[in-house]
Each structure stands twice: as C-alpha cells, then as structure tokens.
Amino acid sequence: MPMNRPLRTAPLLLLLAACAATAPREDTAGAPPATTAATPARSQASRAEIALAPASASLVSGKLTAVPMGAGVHLAGEVGGLAPGAAHAIHVHEKGDCSAVDASSAGAHFNPDGAPHGRAGQGPHHAGDMDNLSADARGVARVNAHLTGVTLGDGGARDIAGRAVIVHAQPDDYRSQPAGNAGARVACGVIRVVR
C-alpha cells in the first residue's frame, strides 16, 4: 500500500495547484466599460479660434479663442465695432454657417437638450447661452465666458466645434423665447479647431 499513497494524492495535489493558479476575480459591477476598438475614447481638441466677421451691414468684428476648461469650454477675446457703452447678446448657434448676409444661416441657439432660453448659470438655458457683452466707450467688449456642459472637438452631441458664435445688436433679456429678443445678428464666426 505504500506505493498507492502517492497515486491517490497526486490528483488532489493537481487540483489544489490548479485552484491556486486561478487569479482572483475583481468586482467590476460599478466600473465603467473598458474602451475597445468598437467604443473608442473621445478626446477633445485643445484650442479653437473664432474669427467674427460683420453681418447685417454692421462694422462689428473680433477674434475669440475657445479652450476646454473644467466641465466645459472657455471663450476669451475681443469684439470691436459695437455701439459704445451698450450691451450686446452673444450666443453659440447650432450651425457653423455664416454665409447669409444677416447670418441667419447659423440657425438657432445651440440647444442639444431642448431647454428653454435663459441666463447661463441661473436655471434652465440653452447650452449656447452666455451673458451679454458690455462695450466700452470705444465700442470694444472683452469676452470672458465659460460654457458649462459643452465639449470642443470630440464629435459628441454637445460639441461646439464647427458651430457659430453670433453677436447681436441688442442685449439678451434672458426671458423672451426662443432667443432673448436680442435683435439683428451683427457678427458671425465659425468655431474652428486649430489643435
């Protein structure tokens, strides 16, 4: 019988060795799905430029930059040719088309959620809504606006790359639907990714 003992314990040792070689399973119930070739990760552009050109026979023009920042996109720059000391509405519009003389080709405000028009940061509003610009005595306004919940160049539904920025003749009243009673479109520029 001493010869049978190693034969009886050999299968038991193999079973124990196989169990020990199995890696422990991690709990993945709350983890996000792994990125595969079928679902690539979306990355944002690092910068876009907006060259605002006159519309509706105005003399308004300017240059803005857009960069991803926090949970949104930050717009900065300068707009000139505005009525001195006046407020002017500025919005991101749904189409990157400034070909119409009155910039109507840019469509409505960028509004992927179907929200009512309002004031950014104060309740429901379009994703493209921003606070009014304030022109100085020379008719120049500095833009320093943050659009929360939008992206830049990732191709998603909330991406503002390829859309247009519009400056209006009047201030936005933040109440009137669908566009804040902001008057004529006096400048238009497409948000173009540069890197």
Question: Positions of the model-derived regions?
Answer:
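N-terminal leader/targeting pre-sequences
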Residues: 2-6, 20-195
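C-terminal motif of bacterial Sec signal peptides marking the signal peptidase cleavage site
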Residues: 16-18
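Sec-dependent signal peptide hydrophobic core
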Residues: 7-14
